[in-house]
Amino acid sequence: MLYRDLTLRERQVLGIIIQSFVVSATPVGSRTIARNYNLGLSDATIRNVMADLEADGFISQPHTSAGRVPTDKGYRYYVDLLMNVSGIDEQEKQMIDARFSTRSSELKGTSAEVLGAAAKVLGSISRQLGVVLPPRLSNAVFERLDIVQLASTRIMVVIAIQSLFVKTIVMELTAEISRQKIDDVVNILNERLSGLTLEEIRSTIGKRLSDCQSREGLMNSIVGAADTLFDESSILDRLYVSGTENIVDQPEFKQPQKVRNIITMIEDKFGIARLVDNALPSGAYQGRDREVAISIGTENRTDNAIDLTIVSSPYYAGKMVGKVGIMGPKRMDYEHAVRVVNYMAGCLSEALSGNN
């Protein structure tokens, strides 16, 4: 976003309005700024500065108040140019490390359990909505496939991806099949598909197994179901969200319609995934090998999220990339959100790589 150059006074006043509003959730007036902050400016001078900020769209006046509140533009200027992010609080660092450090005895369970726990910790520490998107699997490398025989004509296909994620699908067969034939098919599939990405498997499996299909009905069934078996989109069914109560308790969302909008949005897993995935990169903070992204209000481009801010960062599991983030009101402690999200992303990357 392009801005005119704000003067030092304007930057100071805008920063104070945002920081004060984050804490109080009430509009901020010039008298409050003059009384509580040592700017060396009179009440009248501060009023003039606020008038200029309002004229340029950085703050606005709610019709019921004499004070001012930040606009989306004001928040964006703040996170891009004024925000000062320091290191994570030591107590919060210890809380995350205790669960996700590769040296921690608590780091156990499946990757799904690790991601679910990450969402809970994020929601708890930030007092917002913690969100974790599992890694995209299209570029994930297939490791091995196993088949569990559930009945004479029913099997469960278990696909392991880089030892990090497991996908299971139950298939019904048209005829009975022996355990020996199942083992033969499993061996061929693992030999020919191991090391390929899911996308490569979907597009080439027919050619790679063309000499096998005529000899084995199960192989034909596997090839025919490849788009489902090796489809990465179903990973969004395992979106991890925690802390709904933190959002609905915020003063911004006390109106019944706003509560309904928030609940509707939270129940839409694909909608949340799009919002977190499309958050706008912020040049204000560059983490360890990751850039924290922040989308504010109307930047989210959906009516149910115009009152929300999304702070997110990528994490890595081998060659796969997922997203971890926080969703909350625009009246958010941005420095704190960025610190927590960035640190959690780093810990998840280390934890999932350590699980390899």
UniProtKB/Swiss-Prot annotation:
A Pfam entry, by short name: HrcA
Molecular function terms, GO-annotated: DNA binding
Keywords of the record: Repressor, Stress response, Transcription, Transcription regulation
GO BP annotations, alphabetical order: negative regulation of DNA-templated transcription
Gene3D superfamilies in the record: 3.30.450.40, Heat-inducible transcription repressor hrca homolog, domain 3, Winged helix-like DNA-binding domain superfamily/Winged helix DNA-binding domain
InterPro entries hit by this protein: GAF-like_dom_sf (IPR029016), HrcA (IPR002571), HrcA_C (IPR021153), WH-like_DNA-bd_sf (IPR036388), WH_DNA-bd_sf (IPR036390), WHTH_transcript_rep_HrcA_IDD (IPR023120)
SUPFAM superfamilies reported in the protein's UniProt record: GAF domain-like (SSF55781), Winged helix' DNA-binding domain (SSF46785)
Function of the molecule: Negative regulator of class I heat shock genes (grpE-dnaK-dnaJ and groELS operons). Prevents heat-shock induction of these operons.
Family named by the database record: Belongs to the HrcA family.
PANTHER family: HEAT-INDUCIBLE TRANSCRIPTION REPRESSOR HRCA
Name this polypeptide is given: Heat-inducible transcription repressor HrcA
Species name: Chlorobaculum parvum (strain DSM 263 / NCIMB 8327) (Chlorobium vibrioforme subsp. thiosulfatophilum)
